[in-house]
Amino acid sequence: MDCYRKYAAVTLTILSVFLHLLHTFPDGEFLMQGCPECKLGENRFFSKPGAPIYQCTGCCFSRAYPTPMRSKKTMLVPKNITSEATCCVAKAFTKITLKDNVKIENHTDCHCSTCYYHKS
């Protein structure tokens, strides 16, 4: 009998931990592998009820290809592979002025395009 109680306690503990993890990550973020696709997402910081503000969020895939020989000759440290990164950016937007003359862009369409700002 004591053996069954231990198994039941362990099973309930594992189930509680699993349910806790499931509720910790809202909107299915826990189940999502990698990064979501590039799309519009509501910016909860600037949005007001009835006046949502959207921004582009998500990931775009980078591509890699062999470095052309003429480019390799000009490199200080020659690389065999060249990569080209793309970022999720606004394809179209409208400018909005909030309180205190704060101007922001409300994105209306997103796409993957060349990254202009890179982290160092």
Swiss-Prot record:
<dbReference type="GO" id="GO:0046621">
    <property type="term" value="P:negative regulation of organ growth"/>
</dbReference>
<feature type="disulfide bond">
    <location>
        <begin position="87"/>
        <end position="115"/>
    </location>
</feature>
<keyword id="KW-0372">Hormone</keyword>
<feature type="disulfide bond">
    <location>
        <begin position="56"/>
        <end position="110"/>
    </location>
</feature>
<feature type="glycosylation site" description="N-linked (GlcNAc...) asparagine">
    <location>
        <position position="106"/>
    </location>
</feature>
<dbReference type="GO" id="GO:0032275">
    <property type="term" value="P:luteinizing hormone secretion"/>
</dbReference>
<protein>
    <recommendedName>
        <fullName>Glycoprotein hormones alpha chain</fullName>
    </recommendedName>
</protein>
<feature type="disulfide bond">
    <location>
        <begin position="38"/>
        <end position="88"/>
    </location>
</feature>
<dbReference type="GO" id="GO:0032870">
    <property type="term" value="P:cellular response to hormone stimulus"/>
</dbReference>
<keyword id="KW-0732">Signal</keyword>
<dbReference type="GO" id="GO:0035265">
    <property type="term" value="P:organ growth"/>
</dbReference>
<keyword id="KW-0964">Secreted</keyword>
<comment type="similarity">
    <text>Belongs to the glycoprotein hormones subunit alpha family.</text>
</comment>
<dbReference type="InterPro" id="IPR000476">
    <property type="entry name" value="Glyco_hormone"/>
</dbReference>
<dbReference type="GO" id="GO:0016913">
    <property type="term" value="F:follicle-stimulating hormone activity"/>
</dbReference>
<comment type="subunit">
    <text>Heterodimer. Glycoprotein hormones are heterodimers composed of a common alpha chain described here and a unique beta chain which confers their biological specificity to the different hormones.</text>
</comment>
<dbReference type="GO" id="GO:0046884">
    <property type="term" value="P:follicle-stimulating hormone secretion"/>
</dbReference>
<comment type="function">
    <text>Shared alpha chain of heterodimeric glycoprotein hormones. These hormones bind specific receptors on target cells that in turn activate downstream signaling pathways.</text>
</comment>
<dbReference type="GO" id="GO:0005615">
    <property type="term" value="C:extracellular space"/>
</dbReference>
<feature type="signal peptide">
    <location>
        <begin position="1"/>
        <end position="24"/>
    </location>
</feature>
<dbReference type="GO" id="GO:0006590">
    <property type="term" value="P:thyroid hormone generation"/>
</dbReference>
<dbReference type="GO" id="GO:0007186">
    <property type="term" value="P:G protein-coupled receptor signaling pathway"/>
</dbReference>
<keyword id="KW-1015">Disulfide bond</keyword>
<feature type="glycosylation site" description="N-linked (GlcNAc...) asparagine">
    <location>
        <position position="80"/>
    </location>
</feature>
<keyword id="KW-0325">Glycoprotein</keyword>
<dbReference type="GO" id="GO:0010893">
    <property type="term" value="P:positive regulation of steroid biosynthetic process"/>
</dbReference>
<feature type="disulfide bond">
    <location>
        <begin position="60"/>
        <end position="112"/>
    </location>
</feature>
<feature type="disulfide bond">
    <location>
        <begin position="35"/>
        <end position="59"/>
    </location>
</feature>
<dbReference type="Pfam" id="PF00236">
    <property type="entry name" value="Hormone_6"/>
</dbReference>
<dbReference type="GO" id="GO:0030878">
    <property type="term" value="P:thyroid gland development"/>
</dbReference>
<dbReference type="GO" id="GO:0008406">
    <property type="term" value="P:gonad development"/>
</dbReference>
<dbReference type="InterPro" id="IPR029034">
    <property type="entry name" value="Cystine-knot_cytokine"/>
</dbReference>
<dbReference type="GO" id="GO:0016914">
    <property type="term" value="C:follicle-stimulating hormone complex"/>
</dbReference>
<dbReference type="GO" id="GO:0010469">
    <property type="term" value="P:regulation of signaling receptor activity"/>
</dbReference>
